[in-house]
Amino acid sequence: MKYTKEHEWLKMDGLIATVGITSHAAEQLGDLVFVELPTENKVVSLGDEIVVIESVKAASDIQSPADGTIVEINNNIVEDPNLVNSDPLGEGWFFKMEIKDPSILDEMMDENEYLSFIS
């Protein structure tokens, strides 16, 4: 897995990245009550605000971690936003995207670097 400074994780399968937020981010946000996901086949750029989440504490936007195309969204978290809190690294994923340039992954953190970043 790779991690961003915005507390997103990416799990790669070829050029397809499954993207979600880390346990740390989910804990900071508190219980989620609403998730709005991008549409499938949407072309996105690094830094685009593509997911809207609302929790009991705050509203927040999730940015695209790379240039690419959204290929799948997790409708389960739209119906049950609590999945993000209960299983942020598994069933609580947000979307899958085809990454245009995989070299962007070299700029992201591995697990040990991320754990140091949040401590």
Language-model region placement:
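Short, solvent-exposed beta-edge and connector elements
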Residues: Q28-F34, V56, S64-D67
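Acidic, low-complexity mobile loops and tails
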Residues: M1-E49, N82, S86-S119
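Short, Lys/Arg- and Gly-enriched loop/turn segments at beta-strand edges
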Residues: E54-Q63, D80-N82
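A short, compositionally biased micro-patch
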Residues: T4, M12, S55-V56, P65
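Short, charge-rich, low-complexity interaction segments located
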Residues: I70-S86
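Residue-level recognition of beta-strand microenvironments
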Residues: L10-M12, V56, I73-N76, P102
